[in-house]
Amino acid sequence: ATIWSQAGLDLPAWGTTHADYFYGAIPCTRLMTVEEINGEYEYQTGEVIIKTFEERGLDPAQIPAVLVHSHGPFAWGKNAADAVHNAVVLEECAYMGLFSRQLAPQLPDMQPELLNKHY
């Protein structure tokens, strides 16, 4: 997932493994500003994550992960075990996504009906 973060790309929902755990693309945040980086970096990272979900109208309970641009992935859950599980699934989806994009660069998102069926 760090590869997607470094590239500044959302991780699209291309398959049912993704849809079983995440309701749509996993967003990548915007670049952090110089002020955010030089200020309270950890706090500002959290703020950028929150703003990403708010500005895109996303529900963090439905997409329990984010990619922080030029940094890496963050995942959460109902408890520590759930957060770790979501992080593992995120890594697997990112791995599969990389190959999917290589094989089919113009691959569209999965059908909304299939996303809804699996989520």
Give the location of each predicted region.
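Glycine-rich flexible loops
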Residues: A1-Y119
